[in-house]
């Protein structure tokens, strides 16, 4: 779908029902960046999410939630004014905009024209995965996974599977009046299997997802996740205790990146480097790790969980 469609969806979700038009956005932005504010932005967001859980061969739990809000940020030097409203009514939004800009007591507000940013290459389809299957089909999917897992090995004793989906709309207006929109779908199928042999019980896990619809969870995927979880659990039945103490750890791609993030990721964030409190401050372009170590964080992989068409500042 085109960026025009994405923007149309976000406007029809967050602006049109409340009668918010271009002039209202201009007034809000003018308040947020009122002189002498140096930087500011407005962040609209709605999210709906659901989950389904199967245990003991039955889908026993399901949940649904929705939330919305608008955040206003005004920055003056080292000071940041933040305010938010869970209501999208115009009066509530103007009050929040004024509250955010109150760090500049003598500021004068005005208006700023709003322009739309075009997305060259969306990395995922702006559709709602929650609507991609009806409720009975979601239950059937989990039941099919349960049956598949139990058919793989007689030592399978317990199966817990969950299906989760979310659909988020984001609209960001920066201090230059640039409006950026994004539709963010997400699904996840998670599986936990317990096997037992000669009184020993072990667990295996698997799953996957991304910025996709539930329809992507076809028979091939279900079979893959079932096999991975059962294989892992059976291997654990034969596994020996891991030795204690220090040891070399080899990290692969994907989820091990979480360890990299926790170890050094925060030190790479903008604020720490702007304030020169990071160990990496002033080292842009310099080698900061082993010469045989390269770390690539790619947020542009189509339909991947961590991919974004725009970041949370509209870039």
Where are these regions (language model features)?
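Active-site bordering "gate/hinge" segments
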Residues: 1-314
């Amino acid at each position: 779908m085109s960026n025009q469609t994405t923007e149309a969806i976000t406007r029809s979700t967050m602006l049109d029902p409340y009668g918010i038009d271009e002039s209202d956005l201009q007034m809000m932005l003018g308040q947020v960046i009122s002189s002498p504010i140096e930087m500011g932005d407005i962040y609209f967001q709605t999210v709906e999410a659901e989950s389904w859980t199967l245990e003991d061969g039955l889908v026993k739990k399901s949940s649904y939630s929705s939330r919305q809000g608008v955040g206003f940020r005004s920055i003056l030097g080292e000071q940041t004014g933040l305010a938010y409203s869970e209501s999208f009514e115009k009066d509530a939004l103007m009050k929040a905009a004024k509250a955010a800009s109150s760090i500049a007591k003598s500021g004068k507000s005005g208006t700023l024209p709003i322009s739309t940013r075009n997305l060259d290459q969306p990395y995922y389809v702006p559709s709602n995965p929650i609507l991609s299957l009806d409720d009975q089909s979601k239950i059937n999917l989990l039941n099919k996974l349960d049956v598949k897992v139990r058919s793989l090995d007689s030592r399978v004793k317990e199966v817990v599977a969950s299906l989760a989906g979310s659909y988020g709309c984001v609209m960001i207006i920066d201090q230059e009046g640039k409006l950026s929109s994004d539709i963010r779908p997400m699904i996840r199928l998670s599986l936990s299997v317990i096997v037992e042999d000669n009184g020993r019980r072990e667990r295996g896990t698997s799953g996957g997802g991304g910025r996709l619809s539930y329809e992507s969870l076809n028979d091939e995927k279900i079979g893959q996740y079932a096999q991975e979880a059962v294989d892992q659990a059976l291997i654990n039945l034969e596994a020996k205790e891991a030795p204690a103490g220090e040891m070399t750890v080899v990290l692969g791609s994907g989820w091990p990146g979480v360890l990299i993030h926790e170890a050094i990721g925060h030190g790479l964030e903008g604020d720490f480097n702007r304030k020169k409190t990071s160990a990496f401050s002033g080292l842009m372009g310099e080698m900061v790790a082993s010469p045989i170590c390269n770390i690539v964080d790619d947020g542009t992989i189509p339909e991947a969980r961590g991919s974004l068409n725009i970041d949370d500042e509209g870039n």
